[in-house]
Amino acid sequence: MNSRDPFPDEELRRRIMDFIMAAGQTLLENGAEVFRVEQTMEIMARSFHLREFHVYVLTNGIFASAGTAEISEVRNVPVRTTHLGRVAAVNELSRQIAQTGMTLDEAESRLVLARRIPFPKDWVQLVSGMCGAFCFALIFGGTLRSALAAALAGFLASGYLLLCEQHELPGGFCKISCAALITLVCILACRMLGTPASHSIIGSLMILTPGIAFTMGIRDFVHGDYLSGTIRMIDALLIAASIAIGTGLVLSLYTFFTGVVVA
């Protein structure tokens, strides 16, 4: 059975549909933009001669049909992480499918490999959080001692987020508690080092800010995907609110019990 047959039979069409849906799901759950997911799926459908293919993508779901709606499929994508390596691998796969005579069997094998690309090791994420917090503290006008306090907070916060991910804790709780942890560590560390804590707190909190969600929301708006853009913007606002709640709670309690306003 030739997967590049201009007129694939029903069994092959269903296989092609399953492959395209799996590719779209891989893109969406790893941080790709909605318009890019739709575009990539349409390219794959044309390349494999899946006629009358229509797809509608939201931030947490994919709806697609082929033929005269004789084949239709819906996939829920509740989990959204960020792994641009997987996104790049699937995009490259779609280009090769369009430009070469890659068979469906080979494409399915390549997609499995793309979905198995591992996340960075835990120690890389810990060091990245520490370095990011250190640099942001300096960027926002902090001293070297403030940056060192921020680095400690960034290291601990990255470790805490990894634990939350392993135990599958709710995202809102993780963000609130992590922001509270960062604020507390920065206050205590800066008090020991004799330096103001504000720059340390701001620099450390930057590793929690929803930059990707906010940027993706704007891009979705620009491409006319208003519903997906609204969902992403709400997601970004909820994360920002969680950070504010966690930080404000610790600052308020510290001032209440010590009578000292954090500067």
Feature-to-residue mapping (PLM):
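Alpha-helical transmembrane segments and their cytosolic membrane-interface
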Residues: 79-146, 235-244
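C-terminal ends of transmembrane helices
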Residues: 110-114, 157-168, 213-228
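Core alpha-helical transmembrane segments of integral membrane proteins
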Residues: 119-198
